[in-house]
UniProtKB/Swiss-Prot annotation:
Protein name: Trafficking protein particle complex subunit 13
PANTHER family reported for this sequence: TRAFFICKING PROTEIN PARTICLE COMPLEX SUBUNIT 13
GO cellular component: TRAPPIII protein complex
Organism in which the protein naturally occurs: Xenopus laevis
Highest taxon of source: Eukaryota
Subunit structure: Part of the multisubunit TRAPP (transport protein particle) complex.
Gene behind the chain: trappc13
Pfam family for this entry, one: TRAPPC13_C
Family stated for the protein in its record: Belongs to the TRAPPC13 family.
Length: 414
């Protein structure tokens, strides 16, 4: 939309054109039956038309390229490029010509002029050309303000402006979900939907983690001999309009932070997504989300997690598990007592009610326990109780892990 000031006779003319990639020319084929009145007239005209594909004239898509006929859509993350030309339409020399281009957004005003130098003399039929570029980082209304100032031969200073308004639209709809694992791992599921009217080539979708985490992408399938793996989306990574794609990432605490239970517990900032795509004829767009935040998991004052446990055990034969007990409090030292309560299927081996000693804030201890199962099948490990003798508070831990119990005879045969 071009909103100009009241018309005034100026010696200079300002032209602004948005620079975009050309598109393939399309035409509407008109055909008829051979017995109809036109006969082969339409087919002959289409064969002579240079915009049609030879041998496939009835296809709407041609081989010729066409320049944009209108301003078109601009999406967040794309680069806005424009060609600005100031031409001297008069028959006299104009002095001290200066061209300035600003971009006004809802929050700021940016100077896009490549050079602010003043042109001393602009002869008749001469012009000043400039190309501006700007990576669009805000949605909503944008106004390109082009201002021209110059001095005519009489010494009078002249000035005029032109305004070009355009809307920046949102290209992608990004939704995220977090899943907190017992091992301090965080799984991020990112759903990305193409809300434009044209397909996109998804060049890169990566997660830049915060300083406390390492990230691994779970969007590839490892095949025989291919250590790099292949994409779960196949070789053609096009995202059609209104299609949605899901990406999965696993974040693990770095070793220097993994033992600091209180620090990891309170971390809410996970990182940010970096998305790069291409549209028609390779036009690139890039979008970075703001810092993604999760709800901090509530482990309570004491956290018990399983470090090692066998997948399969024999019926009525002892096996060992390793537990990690963490004091999640940042201020209080705990004096813990461990009690082991048998269930219908799980029986603990050892002394119940033993002292574990003092556990300082944000510190952990590892504990190896022995148990056996009297029932076959998939059994849940339950029955652990931790009592803080200072506060006389008991913490119950049930269904902390699962183990497959098979008979000794079955395992021997396998």
């Amino acid at each position: 939309m071009d909103v100009n000031q009241p018309k005034q006779e100026h010696l200079l003319a300002l032209k602004v054109m948005r620079l975009t990639k050309p598109t393939l020319f399309t035409n509407i084929p008109v055909t008829c039956e051979e017995k109809d009145l036109p006969g082969d007239l339409f087919s002959t005209l289409m064969k002579d038309d240079p915009s049609t594909v030879k041998g496939a004239e009835i296809l709407m898509l041609g081989e010729m390229l066409t320049l944009p006929q209108n301003f078109g859509n601009i999406f967040l993350g794309e680069t806005f490029s424009s060609y600005i030309s100031v031409h001297n339409d008069s028959n006299q020399v104009v002095k001290d010509v200066q061209v300035k281009a600003d971009l006004q957004t809802s929050s700021q005003r940016l100077n896009l002029s490549a050079s602010s130098a003043v042109v001393a003399d602009l002869k008749p039929d001469s012009c000043i050309d400039d190309v501006i570029h700007h990576e669009v980082k805000e949605i909503g209304t944008h106004i390109l303000v082009c201002a021209v100032s110059y001095t005519i031969q009489s010494g009078e200073k002249m000035y005029f402006r032109k305004f070009f308004k355009f809307q920046v639209l949102k290209p992608l709809d990004v939704k995220t979900k977090f899943y907190n694992a017992e091992t301090d791992e965080v799984f991020l599921e990112a759903q990305i939907q193409n809300i434009t009217t044209s397909p996109m080539f998804m060049e890169k979708v990566s997660l830049e983690p915060s300083i406390m985490y390492n990230v691994s992408e779970l969007n590839t399938v490892i095949t025989n001999g291919d250590w790099k793996g292949s994409s779960t989306f196949g070789t053609k990574t096009y995202l059609q309009p209104l299609d949605t794609r899901q990406y999965l990432y696993c974040l693990k605490p770095k070793p220097e932070f993994a033992e600091k239970a209180g620090v990891i517990k309170g971390v809410t900032v996970i990182g940010k997504l970096d998305i790069v795509w291409k549209t028609n004829l390779g036009e690139r767009g890039r979008l970075q989300t703001s810092q993604l935040q999760r709800m901090a998991p509530g482990y309570g004052d004491v956290r018990l997690s399983i470090e090692t446990i066998p997948d399969t055990v024999r019926l009525e034969e002892p096996f060992d598990i390793t537990c990690k007990i963490t004091n999640c409090s940042s201020e209080r030292t705990m004096d813990l007592v461990l009690e082991m309560c048998n269930t219908n299927a799980i029986h603990w081996s050892g002394v119940s009610g033993r002292q574990l000693g003092k556990l300082h804030p944000s510190s952990s201890l590892h504990l190896t326990l022995t148990l056996l199962s009297s029932v076959q099948g998939l059994q849940s490990v339950s029955g652990l109780r931790l009592t803080d003798t200072f506060l006389k508070r008991t913490y119950e831990y049930d269904d902390i892990a699962q183990v497959c119990v098979v008979s000794s005879k079955l395992q021997a045969e396998s």
